[in-house]
Amino acid sequence: MSKKDLVGSEAERQVDLLLKARPQVQGDSGEKHDWKDIRVVGELKKSSDEIRTKGTLLQLARYVREVYIAQPARQFVHAFAVCGTKMEAWVFDCSGPYSSGVFDVYKDSEQFFRIVLGYAMMSDEELGLDTFTTPDRNASRTITVNGSEIAEEILLRLDPTPLCSQYAIVCRGTTCFLAKNGDKVEGVAKFSWTSDKRRPEVDLLQLAYQRGVQGIARVLGYRTIISIADLRRGLTFGNPHTFQSRNTSAASSLAQSQSRCKLSRSLTRKRRSPDTRPHAAKRSRSSSQQPKAKQFENELTFTVESVHTPSLFDKNDEVYDNRILRCLVVSPAGRPIYEYKSPLELLMVLQDAIKAHRSLYLDGKILHRDVSENNIIITDPNRVGGRSGMLIDLDLAKEVGSGRSGARHQTGTMEFMAIEVLLNVDHTYRHDLESFFYVLIWQCACHGWRKSKQGLEQPKNSLLKRWYTGSYEEIATYKRGNMEAGGFERI
């Protein structure tokens, strides 16, 4: 299939094989294929030697990432590779890809036809499509959640276009939609796959509300949808795959994380699991975790080596990180901080967000731990008690004095991390305050340019690129140099 025949993506992709939904409009010639309609993707290569290489896996991952971008509510994606006479079927979800193992399509043609026909006959649930929301008028969808203050369920209509979604596979997959009750905007519905070892965000928000915290979002409703353990139930995982290395200049769809809000978002790099390798499993869906970041270092961009060993978690105890898909509806809705309209508004928003952080820490006894431009919103002071900004997203927060979560993925937003946090020092409130300072620098250096230098071309290469590229130690060293006397003026 040529690139011009595939639409619905910001990047030009050429997919060898795909399975798509039937056109909903009668008379559609089907000449164009849209990523939002793709159900299964496949890669076709001439040589059987390509069947179990990083290059083949990464090519499939690129396709899968495009499917996730076009279908942000997708739970998992089926993919397969046919290399010469060899075939391998894959499933990608937010905890990593896993495969069926390799077989010869000539020697086992029955299995080949069974897999292909199986793809064609799968239900929406078996394909990993959005089955937890219901189609509504004007291309929108509805979802039922549990009310936070009343025992009754609440029916909310979601705006068709997400406010925010992630450009990644192995991640929390955070996606946000405006949520309406009738024609009135109630708040924001946030869908995310969080580790089962972390305390649910709704619990922390309700605890903060009970303790009188000011300046954070209020819970309207919540719902637990499904978990990776549910999706993988019945699978038996074998030993990890050993992938061959082949030269490639492609960036990893597994290691690179990019977020978007509306038309543009800044790049966000999340701290990854220190070691997740592919596994084989019995049944047509088998297991594979993300290869070590270090194994990609010569062929992938934005790869980060972790200096952290997950506390209270033995990487040999579990073959994958069990994530739980939850929907959280909060109020009020706001604009991301980088959409500030004036320097004064930027400073007022940051001031109120810092006040909210102070209240969260001192009154709520909760440490946020993920201060970034993605987690500060601009609000209407006339509607939220005079506050121009609020602090959101407690996915990675923890109650002061509690032990380590033991979650496999110790995540954070790379460019805003405090220097000591990058060097594996325990996270404190001071590190969050340091992150607020980096948010201010980021707004001025990255977003302020196009706001105040209209008519001039923004430099293609930013000095701040080194804030999210390389190992943790390299980023910390470079960032420290920027913060020292003589270095700060350069940025």
Q: Residue locations for each model-derived region?
A:
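Intrinsically disordered, low-complexity terminal regions enriched in charged/polar residues
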Residues: 1-316, 320-324, 329, 337-341, ...
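Activation segment of protein kinase catalytic domains, centered on the conserved DFG
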Residues: 335-349
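Short C-lobe core helix of eukaryotic-like protein kinase catalytic domains
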Residues: 351-362
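Catalytic-loop of the protein kinase fold
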Residues: 361-380
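Conserved protein kinase catalytic/activation segment
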Residues: 375-392
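Conserved activation segment of eukaryotic-like protein kinases, specifically the C-terminal portion
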Residues: 406-421
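Conserved end of the kinase activation segment
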Residues: 420-431
